[in-house]
Amino acid sequence: MSAPAQPPAEGTEGAAPGGGPPGPPPNMTSNRRLQQTQAQVEEVVDIMRVNVDKVLERDQKLSELDDRADALQAGASQFESSAAKLKRKYWWKNCKMMIMLGAICAIIVVVIVIYFFT
């Protein structure tokens, strides 16, 4: 920061030290600084608006993603239960086939034994 402006000596209002051309009055300098600060504030406000918009968009996308994840989880649970039912169904079907195969083998063995021992 620059040093604070000192009031001009009497009779030298607006005059530069050393008798040169007059400089801008202190009021103009403060107005210029005020305008620069106001421009910076407006720039920061614009940036913050953009950031808030981005945050809101991100929040919306996250909400949509959360909804999709919930739907996917529900679908996965349904798939898991139907897969377990299907597995159990085919296990019983396999057991029935093994029992039938064993019965057929037993009948064949009985027929062979009866045929050769009679």
Curated annotation (Swiss-Prot):
Cross-referenced InterPro entries: Synaptobrevin-like, Synaptobrevin/VAMP, V_SNARE_CC
Which UniProt keyword terms apply here? Coiled coil, Cytoplasmic vesicle, Disease variant, Membrane, Phosphoprotein, Synapse, Synaptosome, Transmembrane, Transmembrane helix
GO terms for biological process, alphabetical: regulation of synaptic vesicle fusion to presynaptic active zone membrane; SNARE complex assembly; synaptic vesicle priming
Site entry: (Microbial infection) Cleavage: R68, A69
For bias kind Low complexity, which ranges apply? 1-15
Tissue/organ expression = Highly expressed in the zona incerta and rostral periolivary region of the brain. Other neuroanatomical regions show negligible expression. Expressed in the retina, expression observed in the outer segments of the photoreceptors, in the outer and inner plexiform layers, and in a subset of ganglion cells.
Residue ranges of the TM segments: 97-116
What PROSITE patterns does the entry give? SYNAPTOBREVIN, V_SNARE
GO CC terms, sorted: cell surface; glutamatergic synapse; mitochondrion; neuromuscular junction; neuron projection; synaptic vesicle membrane
- Region: Disordered; residue ranges are 1-36
Those parts of the protein on the Cytoplasmic side are 1-96
The record places domain v-SNARE coiled-coil homology at 33-93
What modifications follow translation? (Microbial infection) Targeted and hydrolyzed by C.botulinum neurotoxin type X (BoNT/X) which hydrolyzes the 68-Arg-|-Ala-69 bond and probably inhibits neurotransmitter release. It remains unknown whether BoNT/X is ever produced, or what organisms it targets.
Question: Known Gene3D superfamilies for this protein?
Answer: 1.20.5.110
Cite the ranges annotated as topological domain Vesicular.
Answer: 117-118
Q: Which Pfam families match?
A: Synaptobrevin
Task: Point out residues bearing the modification Phosphoserine.
Answer: S63
Q: Which disease is it linked to?
A: Defects in Vamp1 are the cause of lethal-wasting (lew) phenotype, a mice mutant strain. The lew mutant phenotype is inherited in an autosomal recessive manner and manifests with neurological signs. Lew animals are characterized by a general lack of movement and wasting, eventually leading to death before weaning. The affected animals die near postnatal day 15 (P15). By P10, the mutants are noticeably immobile and lay on their side. Before this stage, mutants can be identified by a failure to attempt to right themselves.
What this chain does, per the entry, is described as:
Involved in the targeting and/or fusion of transport vesicles to their target membrane.
* Subunit: Interacts with VAPA and VAPB.
Tell me which family the UniProt entry assigns to this protein.
Belongs to the synaptobrevin family.
Protein known as: Vesicle-associated membrane protein 1
